[in-house]
Regions:
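N-terminal pre-Walker A segment at the start of P-loop NTPase domains
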Residues: 15-35, 155-170
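Short, small-residue-biased leader/transition segments that mark boundaries at the very start
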Residues: 4-11, 181-186, 193
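Sensor-1/coupling segment of RecA-like P-loop NTPase cores
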Residues: 119-148
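Conserved lysine of the Walker
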Residues: 54
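Post-Walker A alpha-helix
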Residues: 57-59
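A short helix-turn-beta junction within AAA+ P-loop NTPase domains corresponding to the substrate/partner-engaging
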Residues: 139-164
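Conserved P-loop NTPase "ATPase switch" module shared by AAA+ and STAND
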Residues: 89-113
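The conserved Walker
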Residues: 50
């Protein structure tokens, strides 16, 4: 077989696969709120409508990172969690290794090629909250999530937040029936083109 006949892959595709080191469960909670999710790949996107808890999740992690002993927020994870934001994102990112990095929407740098290049050279996992398309980043549609809430607001019960896939992984399979295939082979068009 000719070497040129094999499909080629972009380095960004390899980054998505090569740095997948396993699953990481993350639990972020207070007495009233709880987020529990599992990261399967190094890049996870959270999308959804306003008031679904996306920014609250990032705020809770920021509170924990900035003041771990003085906050009611508890973060349970096998990796350290960080929040990267603002105009100093490059400097923040350069000091983070083998961690889970959360980035909230409104940070314009997430849409840049510079950001995409930088994160592909790291060993971090990234959770990005955004409503925008991120064409420079190689992420899987299987890792785009929304946040669903169970429990009631306005009560003393803990509200439990879980991630759900926005794009399903179900595939549609339809077998070709032999009579359709046979009739197509006998059509005048097929006979002329044969």
């Amino acid at each position: 077989r000719d070497l040129h006949s094999f499909p080629t892959r972009r380095s960004s595709d390899l980054w998505q696969e090569d740095t997948m080191k396993g699953k990481h469960k993350v639990i972020v909670s207070t007495k009233r709120l709880k987020y529990e999710f599992e990261l399967r790949r190094n890049l996870t996107i959270i999308q959804g409508d306003s008031a679904t808890g996306k920014t609250t999740l990032v705020d809770m992690i920021r509170d924990f990172v900035n003041n771990p002993t003085g906050t009611p927020v508890e973060v349970i994870c096998d990796k350290k969690c960080h929040v990267v934001e603002g105009s100093l994102w490059k400097e923040q990112l350069s000091g983070i290794s083998d961690c889970i990095v959360f980035i909230d929407e409104g940070n314009e740098f997430i849409t840049t090629v510079d950001f995409a290049d930088k994160i592909q050279k790291t060993d971090n996992y990234y959770v990005i909250v955004t409503r925008e398309a991120l064409p420079a980043l190689p992420y899987s549609v299987d890792e785009i999530y929304g946040i669903r809430t169970s429990g009631r607001y306005g009560t003393l019960k803990q509200s439990y937040h879980e991630f759900y896939r926005i794009y399903g992984t179900d595939t549609y399979e339809d077998k070709v029936r032999s009579e359709e295939h046979t009739s197509e082979l006998q059509s005048p068009f097929y006979l002329v083109c044969r």
